[in-house]
Design a protein with these regions (language model features):
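Active-site gating loops and adjacent loop-to-helix segments of metal-dependent hydrolytic enzymes
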Residues: 114-136, 173-199
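Short, conserved clusters of charged catalytic residues that mark active-site
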Residues: 90, 94, 140-143, 208-211, ...
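Active-site gating/metal-coordination segments in enzymes
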Residues: 6-142, 146-147
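Mid-to-C-terminal alpha-helical segments outside catalytic/metal-binding sites
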Residues: 1-7, 33-41, 62-66, 74, ...
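Aromatic-lined glycan-binding groove of carbohydrate-active enzymes
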Residues: 144-147, 153-195
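Histidine/acidic-residue-rich catalytic or RNA/ligand-binding cores of hydrolases
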Residues: 116-123, 163-178, 212-218, 231-245
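Histidine- and/or cysteine-centered catalytic micro-motif in compact active-site loops
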Residues: 111-112, 162-164, 205-207
Length: 269
């Protein structure tokens, strides 16, 4: 209320998959049930994202379905890595396929990278300072090159922090295929930038640099930017103040704050 935010979409945070399969599954179901009670009490203020441990694909598919059908959840908050696998892994495909069938977007949330070179200098390097952006960028790039968006052409994916590394590298990704024809084992049927026009949206969460926003706007278009907050890791007020400080016109402000979410994801605001 203090920040003027009318509706938030909630999920539990990192860590649900760090235990054995049975414990992780019980924790996920219990957390989903508890969060659903909050949403049911204030449905005009909150919506929910499911968080799924990926030890067992069959469980993940069933729990995502339960979250949608019984609890009214909006999407799947998937991590950028699940320890030994990422979202391009064949074990994850049935869950992505079910998300499409349920018309649930997939938010790729950063997880601590399992990349040795990112470790050794503390949290600032391995988490939000660098590692999170790198890990999400790797995962989404692998999904593109694996042809997942070609197999699931209506899959909708959201990433945060003004698009992680993509605003700066997307053209070079295109050129590596279009000009240099470095295809290797890549199975994507379109240039990477085309999936950002049809399947991928970004949020403004936790990146308060005006030139970075302008870059993301130029690369992706204002229609592909959603308001996000990273709350409680970041300040709600600071997120709102940042967007309002950019000098956007009323139409663009509306698009970022609510219209894109309503138009492309049918979020009820």
């Amino acid at each position: 209320d203090e920040a003027g935010v009318d509706k938030c979409f909630l999920s539990i945070s990192l860590g649900i998959g760090q235990f054995d399969a049975q414990t992780s599954q019980k924790l996920a179901m219990a957390n989903h049930d508890e969060l659903a009670q909050v949403i049911a009490k204030y449905p005009h203020r909150f919506g929910g994202y499911a968080v799924l441990p990926m030890h067992d694909t069959e469980f993940a598919v069933k729990e995502l379905t339960r979250c949608h059908d019984e609890l009214g959840y909006f999407g799947w908050n998937a991590f950028s890595n699940f320890g030994d696998k990422r979202l391009d892994d064949k074990a994850c495909f049935p869950v992505l396929e079910r998300a499409v069938q349920l018309n649930m977007p997939v938010y790729i949330h950063p997880s601590v990278p399992q990349i040795p070179d990112l470790h050794g200098y503390g949290p600032a390097m391995v988490t939000s300072g660098l590692g999170f952006a790198v890990d999400v960028t790797i995962t989404l790039t692998r999904m593109i090159f694996a042809g997942i968006f070609d197999r699931l052409p209506t899959l909708k994916v959201i990433i945060g922090h003004l698009g992680e590394c993509f605003p700066m590298i997307l053209r070079r990704m295109d050129d590596s295929l279009r000009v240099q024809k470095i295809t290797g084992k890549a199975r994507n049927q379109k240039l990477p930038s085309e999936y950002f026009k049809e399947n991928i949206w970004i949020t403004s969460s936790g990146n308060f640099l005006a030139p970075a926003f302008q870059c993301a706007k130029d690369v992706f278009g204002i229609e592909h930017i959603l308001f996000g907050t990273d709350y409680p890791m970041e300040s709600l007020n600071e997120n709102v103040d940042f967007i309002e400080s950019l000098g956007l016109g009323e139409e663009d402000l509306d698009r970022v704050f609510w219209k894109n979410a309503e138009e492309y994801f049918h979020m009820k605001m």
